[in-house]
Regions:
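Active-site acidic/histidine proton-transfer and metal-coordination neighborhood
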Residues: 16-17, 55-59, 74-173, 180, ...
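Glycine-rich, proline-tolerant flexible connector loops at the mouths of alpha/beta enzymes
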Residues: 33-53, 107-114
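Conserved beta-strand positions in the central sheet of alpha/beta enzyme cores
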Residues: 31, 65-67, 104, 142, ...
Length: 270
């Protein structure tokens, strides 16, 4: 298993500094949020891209994943749909340029117009288009189990990966998202996606006074020990999606919190 640091752990921190920290923490790579208003986006100037790639080489920390936020690949509005598919394709091409292996994708939004089947079919068509580009670039698009999408559950995500039916499109397994957002049990989430998982997001939460509270992995309700016992971890990428960006007051700083997560998972897999 290879361990990846996620820049969501370091809100507002420039990517070179994030690379340096994750290298010091003995991680195996970096997942970079690619969104306007953050330190990295897909229209970043060439000079800044070069600086990031040079830092990746200097600190021996590969860029593993780019994580853009193109929600509306299944929009009923043609122009909006094309804009989002185009953005995902641009992220794929940028990932290839930067030597990355994965691009995170949403499975379309569940708030799009149309029936459930129409929304699902448009998402599948969009991912086939992007998947062809990814196949040519040697990139894998990973569809996340994520709230607000057509792939909230493991069953939904597995169906979408099956319908796309391309080696360049796999599932991004996020048991924390599914446990909190849906009624699907953790074992179903895992087994339904068996053979389709290309990447893992690792995080945790607990319920305090009826409210969700982000926490260090191993201190919450996600059954990571049981999950890891059933996963084939040999060639797997596990990204610590330490959500300091969304929960700044609930999580300790990444410099101490991420190592605690890493230590827990390393001990769990022996």
């Amino acid at each position: 298993m290879r361990f990846v640091g996620h820049t969501m752990a370091l809100p507002g921190v420039d990517i070179v500094s994030a690379i340096k920290l994750f290298s010091e923490l003995k991680l195996d790579g970096i997942e970079i949020v690619a969104q306007e208003g953050t330190p990295f986006h897909i229209d970043l100037p060439e000079s800044e891209l070069y600086e990031i790639m040079e830092a990746s080489d200097r600190y021996n920390l590969p860029i593993i994943t780019l994580t853009p936020y193109f929600w509306h690949i299944n929009s009923a509005d043609h122009n909006e749909r094309e804009k989002n598919i185009g953005g995902l394709i641009r992220a794929v091409r940028l990932a290839e340029k930067m030597g990355a292996q994965f691009v995170r994708a949403y499975g379309g939004t569940d708030s799009a117009s149309g029936s459930e089947e129409e929304k699902f079919a448009r998402a599948v068509d969009a991912l086939k288009i992007a998947g062809r580009e990814a196949e040519q670039a040697g990139i894998t698009i990973i569809i996340e189990n994520h709230p607000g999408t057509m792939t909230r559950t493991g069953i939904q995500t597995a169906r979408m990966v099956h319908e796309v039916n391309m080696g360049s499109v796999k599932a991004l397994y996020d048991p924390c998202n599914v446990l909190y957002d849906t009624d699907e049990d953790w074992l179903t989430t895992l087994t339904s996606q068996a053979g389709k998982i290309g990447y893992i997001h690792c995080k945790d939460y607990r319920i305090v006074n009826g409210e969700r509270m982000a926490c260090v992995v191993g201190e919450g309700i996600v059954p990571w020990l049981e999950i890891l016992d059933r996963l084939d971890t040999k060639d797997c990428y596990l990204s610590f999606e330490y959500e300091k960006r969304w929960y700044p007051d609930q999580l300790e700083d990444a410099e101490t919190g991420v190592p605690r997560c890493l230590d827990y998972i390393r001990r769990a897999i022996g």
